[in-house]
């Protein structure tokens, strides 16, 4: 995950142990990951960077789609430890490299990757433009940046009732689905996470129009946005260098 506040970092460390049991069981999250992999146009032997890899859900889907090589980064040591267990269990050490590194501090060579992907992770980054520029520089010509996230604009004053209503319109659907698909455990996590979105406590979601503008400003000439069919407030952005 991206670099976040101390309290929020501890919250994600605590979440690591039941991450797969909550978010990993949410169907729309898997729909988002599957859409991101398909939209990436992954090919055999591509070099992939997975930003905010968590416990490896997206990376493993990339490997299921093509014989690629993955560098996976996350700021949470506990998330990476769980991912490393999967890597060892499935004998994937020659295909996946895990590094504890926040998105803001990631070190990549110019033109190193064919695909750079981030799902529900870059909204933790407060200053997004420098990270998007670094992503652009780290892609090969024709490389693809793939972003999957919720299309929710949380910018503005915390005491603005209009902003609060805008966020709650999204969160109400998320909370209902969390309870339906993951039970009380998933609901509690989503409820706690929702408060962080409202207070901008390590959560800084922006709209996909704002993401697209950041990508174009970084130099990407082509930017496309794909909404999930059943969950239109989740989208995948593909920016081609």
Can you say where each PLM-predicted feature lies in the sequence?
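C-terminal alpha-helical "lid/dimerization" subdomain adjacent to the S-adenosyl-L-methionine
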Residues: 150-216, 224-225
């Amino acid at each position: 995950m991206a670099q976040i506040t101390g309290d929020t970092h501890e919250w994600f460390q605590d979440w690591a142990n039941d991450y797969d049991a909550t978010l990993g069981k949410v169907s729309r999250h898997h729909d988002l990951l599957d859409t991101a992999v398909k939209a990436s146009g992954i090919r055999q032997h591509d070099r992939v960077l997975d930003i905010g890899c968590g416990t490896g859900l997206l990376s493993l889907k990339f490997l299921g789609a093509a014989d690629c090589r993955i560098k996976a980064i996350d700021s949470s040591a506990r998330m990476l430890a769980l991912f490393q267990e999967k890597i060892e269990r499935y004998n994937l050490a020659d295909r996946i490299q895990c590094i504890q590194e926040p998105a803001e501090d990631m070190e990549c060579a110019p033109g190193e990757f064919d695909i750079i992907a981030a799902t529900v992770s870059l909204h933790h980054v407060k200053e997004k433009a420098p990270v998007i520029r670094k992503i652009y520089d780290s892609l090969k010509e024709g490389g693809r940046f793939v972003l999957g996230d919720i299309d929710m604009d949380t910018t503005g004053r915390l005491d603005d009732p209009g902003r609060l209503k805008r966020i709650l319109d999204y969160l109400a659907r998320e909370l209902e689905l969390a309870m339906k698909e993951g039970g009380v455990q998933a609901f509690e996590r989503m409820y706690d996470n929702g408060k962080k979105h409202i207070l901008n406590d390590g959560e800084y979601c922006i709209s996909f129009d704002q993401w697209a503008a950041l990508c174009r400003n970084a130099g990407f000439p082509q930017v496309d946005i794909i909404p999930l069919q059943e969950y239109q407030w989740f989208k995948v952005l593909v920016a081609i260098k």
